[in-house]
């Protein structure tokens, strides 16, 4: 009888948590890599991604993404980083008001893939994401998706600019992102975007400190088609930096990815990245390219093996060649 009473009490206490938490989902993603080059070989832990979604009511929802990764400056050698924290309010139909920290919707890759490597078509992001692409933005905006027969979508977002952090803007200027896309077929998406920001003198972005004020504009275009057999993804971004006392300098970053499913679970692929810098606003940044040849083995939709050969060429530096293997999972 005592055990029965204790069990009943536990159910009564736990009941409210089950009721209120029934629309919350917690998922995880992780990857482990192995790399080999002429300088040596290493095993490495990738990012462990904690992915939370929750429907608070019929209009309000939440998305949170926190990663845990190696950090040389941490006493435990690991650090947590909040990559996305989004509160979504459904205004009408497929139109939403969003607030928080998002992946800046400048192109298909940044808008479609989160930090779970299991969904990446290749092991790493293209080179452009290490340079001029603003990966994250913290602010407020509106978005729409799957509108009409062409599945039209749009994003308008105002945020703290480059050089800011997640709790404080470093100047009075705000960045603005406008993007739109449509889907002429079920597997194809074509889109374009415009990003504008004023970077203050002394700000640091993409690992570079700006010694002059820069008005940055980014124009991006993308086309993606992931069919049953053929996978194609091509994106390009033209950057225009209006630099105090210098004038306008340009940067062009692009990549092309192609994969072909030769068997149900086997997809060989190639990717070519290219970045061309022009002008003093980019400091020590050098023109670079990257060739990737690989194969992806899809164990299932939550477990993937990838093997790649990478050749990276940077102006004024020796070529870097390596072989990388990765296992990525979701759970």
Please give the residue ranges for each predicted region:
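Surface loops at the rim/top face of extracytoplasmic beta-rich domains
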Residues: 163-178, 201
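Bacterial Sec-dependent N-terminal signal peptides
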Residues: 1-24
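Alpha-helical transmembrane segments and their juxtamembrane interfaces
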Residues: 13-15, 68, 111, 245
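Outer membrane beta-barrel
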Residues: 23-35, 39-161, 172-174, 181-190, ...
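Outer-membrane beta-barrel pore domains
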Residues: 31-38, 74-75, 86-90, 98-101, ...
